[in-house]
């Protein structure tokens, strides 16, 4: 197998404009290659989302998880080359999805092809869990595949997610968990009136200031060795006033918690509503939990990934739970050990998204090394 196989496959995937939740043939490209090396492939499509579950072997299962969808290109003028025409310049591959995460998908596939060629009768089961709904709502993607696996009582012992975890150098950061995310959609009610006659109105903005000061200054928890303390950010405020001489009748506010495993989403809801009542506010509130925190403590998978990075990248990776949510929050429902290991994330979602060719090839070797160590007897 030529040394440029991973680059060629990455280019093929990048050339497909699979803006979320569209797949447009990426998974067919991958599944055809997997079928050629003995994989069984199941399509679990939902609405516009393409989902793929592929597997080979039986027993202890190592799954690779990834997504074929990408974010929109943004302002095309900012790109130095067409975003869906993969371009190599001075050892760097440019294109939308190169880092997040078609490069990692290519590395996974080629790594498995190499491993199977060397060990066609390998121990255990290798699997792929791939969706085209990760960058958008994630309602029809990995969560649906996991739901099907749970119904069938299928197990994933170990899972490598190809999210771009690295920061400065390939392998310098690996994710062994993620914080939870819960969003509040709050409406505070007052009484509309003329701004010159405040005694005849009840300003919901003024009424809520003390509440918001307490909300953002409150210590929700102290975190722990794995997680930073729970934090809250207000990200949208809007009143219903359409005139500069009118006190609004209501104020709508959106805020989001990123929370550790020291607190639950239910605890957060209860504490926020106690604060609202403490400040005697008339309100309505809706909540959306995007995901609960998950954590893979030190164990076989994290040990193997760390050793592989040390051997091939010559650095000691940092274990981290920072950043946003990932599809690991769904896979965690299977009780799997989960590690996120992928390319450098400096250019993800930006114009001129790119990866170094040497990193792409090295990631492929890393994945193959991990597979070999997982299944060695």
From Swiss-Prot:
What is the protein's species of origin? Buchnera aphidicola subsp. Baizongia pistaciae (strain Bp)
Write out the catalysed reaction: N-succinyl-(2S,6S)-2,6-diaminopimelate + H2O = (2S,6S)-2,6-diaminopimelate + succinate
Q: Could you tell me which InterPro entries the record lists for this protein?
A: ArgE/DapE_CS, Bact_exopeptidase_dim_dom, DapE_proteobac, Peptidase_M20, Peptidase_M20_dimer, Peptidase_M20A
- Source organism superkingdom: Bacteria
Which EC number applies?
Answer: 3.5.1.18
Give the matching PANTHER family: ACETYLORNITHINE DEACETYLASE, N-ACETYL-L-CITRULLINE DEACETYLASE
The UniProt entry's GO biological process terms, in alphabetical order, are: diaminopimelate biosynthetic process; L-arginine biosynthetic process; lysine biosynthetic process via diaminopimelate
> What molecular functions are annotated in GO for this chain?
acetylornithine deacetylase activity; cobalt ion binding; succinyl-diaminopimelate desuccinylase activity; zinc ion binding
Which UniProt keyword terms apply here? Answer: Amino-acid biosynthesis, Cobalt, Diaminopimelate biosynthesis, Hydrolase, Lysine biosynthesis, Metal-binding, Zinc
Q: How does it assemble?
A: Homodimer.
Q: Which CDD domains match?
A: M20_DapE_proteobac
Q: Does the keyword Amino-acid biosynthesis apply?
A: yes
Q: What is this protein called?
A: Succinyl-diaminopimelate desuccinylase
Cofactor(s) listed: Zn(2+); Co(2+)
Q: Which gene encodes it?
A: dapE
Q: Where does Zn(2+) 2 bind?
A: 100, 135, 349
Tell me the route in metabolism or biology where this protein functions. Answer: Amino-acid biosynthesis; L-lysine biosynthesis via DAP pathway; LL-2,6-diaminopimelate from (S)-tetrahydrodipicolinate (succinylase route): step 3/3
Which Gene3D superfamilies does the protein's record reference?
Answer: Zn peptidases (3.40.630.10)
Enzyme active site: 69, 134
């Amino acid at each position: 197998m030529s040394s440029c196989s991973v680059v060629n496959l990455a280019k093929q995937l990048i050339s497909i404009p699979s803006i979320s939740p569209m797949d447009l043939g990426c998974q067919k490209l991958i599944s055809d290659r997997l079928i050629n090396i003995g994989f069984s492939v199941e399509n679990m499509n939902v609405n516009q989302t393409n989902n793929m579950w592929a597997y080979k072997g039986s027993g202890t299962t190592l799954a690779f998880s990834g997504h074929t969808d990408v974010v929109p290109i943004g302002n095309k003028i900012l790109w130095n080359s067409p975003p869906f025409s993969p371009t190599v310049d001075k050892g760097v591959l440019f294109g939308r999805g190169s880092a997040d995460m078609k490069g990692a998908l290519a590395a996974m596939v080629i790594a498995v092809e190499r491993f199977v060629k060397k060990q066609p009768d390998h121990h255990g089961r290798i699997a792929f869990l791939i969706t085209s709904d990760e960058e958008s709502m994630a309602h029809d993607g990995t969560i649906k595949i996991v739901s099907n696996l749970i119904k069938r009582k299928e197990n994933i012992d170990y899972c490598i997610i190809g999210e771009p975890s690295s920061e400065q150098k390939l392998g310098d950061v690996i994710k062994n968990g993620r914080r939870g995310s819960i969003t509040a959609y709050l409406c505070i009610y007052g009484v509309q009136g003329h701004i010159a006659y405040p005694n005849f109105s009840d300003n919901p903005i003024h009424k809520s200031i003390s509440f918001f000061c307490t909300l953002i200054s409150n210590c929700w928890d102290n975190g722990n060795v794995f997680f930073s303390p729970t934090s809250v950010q207000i990200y949208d405020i809007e009143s219903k006033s359409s005139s500069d001489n009118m006190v609004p009748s209501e104020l709508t506010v959106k805020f989001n918690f990123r929370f550790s495993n020291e607190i639950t989403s239910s605890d957060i809801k209860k504490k926020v509503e106690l604060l609202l009542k403490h400040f005697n506010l008339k309100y309505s509130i809706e909540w959306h939990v995007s995901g609960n925190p998950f954590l893979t403590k030190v164990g076989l998978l994290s040990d193997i990934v760390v050793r592989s990075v040390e051997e091939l990248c010559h650095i000691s990776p940092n274990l981290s739970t920072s950043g946003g949510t990932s599809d690991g929050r769904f896979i965690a429902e299977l009780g799997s050990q989960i590690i996120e290991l992928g390319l450098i994330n400096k250019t993800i979602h930006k114009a001129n998204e790119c990866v170094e060719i040497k990193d792409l090839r090295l990631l492929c070797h890393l994945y193959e090394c991990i597979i070999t160590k997982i299944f060695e007897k």
